[in-house]
């Protein structure tokens, strides 16, 4: 009996160390950033079982077998659709401004199409204005409405949007609604899904959270896009979820959420439509390619239009493109670079690009919320402040609520707006979308919004920052070490 017990004990110990060695080897063999690999190894060596379970659950990008197969299967038809779109040569920009040209060329090479011109674009900063405009557009819709959001929170004006969407479905408009399972948990627990389906709306719960499948797909891989397309001609995107800020997270202690949305008319809606169709097929297996490009591209006035490129990220889309786009934008800056984000946990490369821009004389400003709804990200963000301040970067802490806007402005001409936070999840994990806009007029509008944010912010004093308590420095470094995992 003692011999059997001893043998079992040795086998258990051997299996334990083989498991640790196997996971270690797997981490080392994966092509990943060194800080991320080191952070995972530290967790596994300090808390082996917890670390191994955590790594297998969220350490690698698992879309899931079924979704991965759909992603592979959809590309032949998607590629053909993109080739057909290229035949509509009159919608594509042939040249760009000097500051935007490198970024637009990068996107064209990696995504297969150039930026589209002739779009009308309106910047919107008030949630009431966004929802009222959206309700009007829904009421005037004639063919189809496609919507995807990370969060849909019932209450306030969000319910009015839901009512207008159901009314559209009842009068024969084809309506599709895709919402992230984790972000929209309150919606899926409410009566709204059943009401919408009964009205004729196709409602899809994207990336369902299922603990039974935690090792088959990453549970923290989320559908983070916010997009609305109407009749393949009107489109919305930006940082705003389908929530009424007056009712959303009022007990979080961070104030009202501050967002930015763009409303567009023109061929950009078709370019966004193909992104939506890919997401829909990955999630449902159903192919819903937009109408042939030569049918739905409307006449436009080229001289008064904006040139826009859509940048999509996530499994099945060009890897690392949004990260490359941000690096390209930072290195293209010659006069000034302004960035706004609620969550700032940049990669080493992006941090270096931002600091280098400041060190070569570019006026660099970063606007962050003073209070954050994520304690982990809030502390991790602070760990980068010393290096940024030393390089000459101006850090503004917004005091008018939770600044949720994600925007970048380069030299007043190249603008990036969308759903992408400057953190690891947005850069390498989630389904995201960013618009790259090459236009001085839009740049002036975005600059005015950013100036308003700055007027409601406090400039971080480098001298006072260096005098902060020791315990804060220790906490910052602790969270900094785990920043590659956030």
Curated annotation (Swiss-Prot):
Cross-referenced InterPro entries: Cardiolipin_synthase, CL_synthase_A, CLS_N, PLD-like_dom, PLipase_D/transphosphatidylase
BP GO terms, sorted: cardiolipin biosynthetic process
Catalysis performed (reactions): 2 a 1,2-diacyl-sn-glycero-3-phospho-(1'-sn-glycerol) = a cardiolipin + glycerol
Keyword Cell membrane: yes
Record's keyword terms, sorted: Cell inner membrane, Cell membrane, Lipid biosynthesis, Lipid metabolism, Membrane, Phospholipid biosynthesis, Phospholipid metabolism, Repeat, Transferase, Transmembrane, Transmembrane helix
Recorded GO MF terms: cardiolipin synthase activity
Domain spans labelled PLD phosphodiesterase: 219-246, 399-426
Localization of this protein: Cell inner membrane
GO cellular component: plasma membrane
Top-tier EC class: transferase
Active site: 224, 226, 231, 404, 406, 411
Any Pfam family hit: PLDc_N
Topology of this chain in the membrane: Multi-pass membrane protein
Domain of life from the UniProt record: Bacteria
Annotated transmembrane regions: 3-23, 38-58
Enzyme Commission number(s) of this protein: 2.7.8.-
Similarity-based family: Belongs to the phospholipase D family. Cardiolipin synthase subfamily. ClsA sub-subfamily.
Record's function text: Catalyzes the reversible phosphatidyl group transfer from one phosphatidylglycerol molecule to another to form cardiolipin (CL) (diphosphatidylglycerol) and glycerol.
Record's protein name: Cardiolipin synthase A
Species of provenance: Shigella boydii serotype 4 (strain Sb227)
Gene behind the chain: clsA
